[in-house]
């Protein structure tokens, strides 16, 4: 009889072991929130099965990563949500390109939706800096509705932690120093017309109706506080409309933004302290600006000075051009300056040169005490 019971037990264990991770973990174990939220950005693996995603997540989960900001279609994101059920406390965020639409077949079918620079070049045809910069105009009602509908398609996903807006801005009117000097070999000592966007006819008409003149009538439109504030408002109102719809769906809204408010406003017309976000992820990529690690503290402190923790501040760090020791220091500086969490761009880069161990050290120090 004991042999029969033992055999039956082994059969049950075997059946359990071959079940997909999602089937084995239907009920999530309640877990405490991390004191310091740790996360990664990355692209989805379009061909990955749920079980292979579970295996991919394993080393990150062991290092304390609990938030995955994944870029892919709603159908692809759904597989990551299912895989996350294997790990208590893991959250999936749908990272979406918003105003920039380089590979978006729906948007690309509407050249009239794309933004225009001060020279008059349309972003559909003219590539500022790189070919994957294809900027929609937030002043075109149809483009605006499309961006909101796109966010809604992610918000409809059951189990999603947040809709994560990226490229929710205008083109970089001014690049960081290092990008100017070494990547693009240009000098931007003023707002050059070919990089200064927002001049779509719909935007010009809307501005003209409000102020009685076109920004193009001005000798130096980039110096006009009214034209600056107009563009800030166009993006901010879009975000807040998306926020209202996302929150009505019961989901949170997060966004990847430029480092601190003054820089964000001046360079990409992004006024993120006024946005109705649940999580804000400033990309504190100090190397892009030829700054040292101490600059990260400056950026975090200046961001929090305007947001006062009305939403969670998660400091974004660029992984590929930093040592493991400096990555640890950068994360620690972010947290000690007030950040509620740290995101790493990107997950794949953490698997090199001992960098995932730096994340593990941060998790041990702040979350496992």
Predicted regions mapped to residue ranges:
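Active-site-adjacent "subsite" loops/lids of carbohydrate-active enzymes
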Residues: 93-156
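Substrate-binding cleft of secreted/luminal carbohydrate-active enzymes
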Residues: 277, 282-295, 303, 309-369
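Aromatic- and acidic-residue-enriched segments that line the glycan-binding/catalytic groove
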Residues: 100-128, 168-216
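Boundary/entry segment of secreted carbohydrate-active catalytic domains
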Residues: 25-55, 255-259, 320
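Aromatic-lined carbohydrate-recognition surfaces of secreted/lumenal glycan-active proteins
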Residues: 164, 171, 195-217, 222-266, ...
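Catalytic domains of carbohydrate-active enzymes, especially glycoside hydrolases
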Residues: 50-76, 157-162, 274-280, 337-341
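The substrate-binding groove and active-site-proximal loops of carbohydrate-active enzymes
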Residues: 41-46, 65-71, 129-145, 223-234, ...
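Substrate-binding cleft/loops of secretory-pathway carbohydrate-active enzymes
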Residues: 173, 252-290, 322-325
């Amino acid at each position: 009889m004991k042999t029969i019971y033992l055999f039956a037990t082994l059969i049950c264990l075997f059946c359990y072991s071959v079940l997909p991770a999602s089937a084995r973990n239907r009920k999530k174990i309640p877990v405490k929130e991390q004191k310091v939220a740790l996360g990664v950005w990355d692209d989805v693996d379009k061909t990955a099965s749920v079980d292979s995603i579970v295996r991919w997540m394993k080393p990150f989960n062991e290092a304390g990563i609990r938030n995955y900001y994944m870029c892919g279609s709603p159908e692809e994101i759904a597989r990551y949500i299912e895989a996350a059920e294997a790990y208590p406390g893991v959250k999936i965020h749908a990272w979406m390109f918003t105003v920039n639409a380089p590979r978006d077949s729906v948007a690309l079918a509407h050249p009239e939706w794309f933004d225009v620079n001060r020279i008059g070049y349309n972003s559909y045809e003219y590539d500022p800096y790189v070919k994957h910069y294809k900027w929609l105009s937030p002043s075109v009602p149809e483009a605006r509705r499309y961006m909101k509908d796109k966010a809604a398609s992610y918000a409809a996903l059951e189990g999603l932690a947040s809709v994560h807006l990226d490229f929710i801005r205008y083109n970089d009117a001014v690049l960081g120093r290092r990008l100017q000097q070494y990547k693009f070999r240009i000098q931007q000592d003023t707002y050059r017309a070919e990089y200064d966007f927002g001049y779509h006819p719909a935007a010009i008409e809307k501005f003209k109706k409000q102020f009685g003149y076109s920004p193009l009538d001005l000798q130096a439109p980039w110096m006009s506080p009214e034209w600056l504030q107009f563009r800030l408002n166009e993006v901010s109102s879009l975000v807040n409309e998306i926020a209202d719809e996302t929150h009505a769906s019961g989901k949170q809204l997060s966004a990847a933004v430029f480092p601190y408010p003054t820089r964000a406003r001046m360079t990409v017309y992004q006024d993120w302290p006024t946005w109705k976000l649940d999580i804000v992820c400033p990309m504190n990529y100090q190397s892009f600006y030829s700054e040292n690690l101490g600059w990260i503290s400056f950026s975090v402190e200046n961001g929090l000075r305007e947001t006062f923790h009305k939403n969670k501040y998660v400091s974004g760090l660029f992984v590929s051009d930093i040592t493991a020791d400096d990555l640890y220091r950068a994360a620690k500086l972010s947290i000690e300056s007030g950040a509620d969490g740290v995101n790493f761009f990107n997950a794949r880069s953490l698997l090199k040169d001992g960098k995932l161990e730096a994340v593990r050290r941060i998790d041990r120090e702040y979350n496992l005490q």
